[in-house]
Amino acid sequence: MKWKTKVNVRARKLPLLINTMGWTAAQGKRLGLEKSILEKYFPNRVNWINPTSNTNAKIDASFESNSGRRYTMRVYIPNDFPSSCPNMVIKEPASRIPDFPNLRTSHAGPRNHEGYLLICHFDKSKWSGQHTLYEVLMKGRLWLEAYEGHLSTGNEIDYYLKHMGE
């Protein structure tokens, strides 16, 4: 499946998200756009953490899977966003998500500096500034459903995600 959800980040003029501090003016405007997109599609489910810091900004997004389990995903916003692909982890329930021996078939990496499991959502070489945090979270949401499919059937996570294109 090809992801066709692209947002023309130049088409809309929005106020700055924040007093940009370490962010450039263009990054501040972009983060304002990202914030409005996330508020529209994930109302009351996204929490911005340190949004004025271009070295420690992140978002936590809460989701409920189709089976009713609750998860929180964390996205780390890189200091050169949107030029670089952000990292994403499963923050909660961190203890329930195991380490996977085969990173290729699980689409999950090692644990990060906070001890959370990294989730592969984009090939970093295919990332462009036209991708959005909304797309990152949607791919994370799909990973959660594939993970739950893995729990119920024993199939590799890749079984559910192998059809996804970048």
Please identify what each model-predicted range represents.
Residues M1-R74, D80-E166:
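UBC/E2-like fold recognition across ubiquitin and ubiquitin-like conjugation systems
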